A protein has these predicted regions:
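Single conserved hydrophobic/aromatic residue that forms the stacking wall/gate
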Residues: 164, 168-176
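A general "terminal functional-core" signal
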Residues: 1-167
Length: 176
């Protein structure tokens, strides 16, 4: 599990409090199994309730979403989840798993986020990190688009939004 290994590696170098924000459509069961009982980490997973894995691991904050969940419902749930993360934990590093599979064009995702909704999702997470003045590492995750270009476009959009966010943050004296 790349996110859990990264969190453990960083913590071996310096004892950071690490939040893993997993927005891949599949529950972050590996991350939950590895970090779920670690008080120096916080794992958030927004995932398709009826999607693989069918037996979910306990995480710090797991939110199962119904099939067909679209932009408005997803973004409202994510916004509340980020508030809950901040209420329960103070991250010093965020690892963001930016799944492409919540996109409406994904063959396996079963959610219905548009490209605009995916961009708003990324803006919420990047803004959350910026408000906390917390560095963020982004990993591209998931993506089984009917057309590979759709998956590429989703990931490219995430990178472009992060580049814009990084420029904004560095002009304020810190880099995410």
């Amino acid at each position: 599990n790349d996110a859990a290994v990264a969190a453990c590696y960083v913590q071996a170098l310096q004892p950071f409090c690490v939040a893993v924000i997993d927005l891949d459509v599949h529950q972050g069961n590996g991350t939950a199994a590895i970090l779920g009982r670690d008080s120096s980490c916080f794992t958030l997973s927004l995932h398709g309730e009826k999607n693989f894995p069918f037996r979910k691991e306990d995480s710090h904050l797991d939110i199962g979403l119904p099939d067909g969940c679209g932009d408005d419902e997803y973004l409202k749930i994510l916004q509340h989840a980020l508030i809950e993360v901040e209420r329960r934990f103070t991250p010093e590093l965020i690892i963001y798993l930016a799944g492409a599979d919540p996109h409406e064009g994904d063959r396996l995702g079963r959610l219905k986020l548009t490209m605009h909704g995916m961009a708003d999702r990324d803006r919420l997470v990047l803004g959350f990190a910026r408000e906390l003045r917390c560095p963020i590492a982004i990993a591209m995750a998931g993506g089984y688009g009917r057309h590979i270009q759709t998956t590429v476009d989703v990931h490219h959009q995430t990178i472009q939004l992060d580049r814009k966010s990084t420029r904004l943050n560095s002009s304020h004296g810190y880099i995410s």
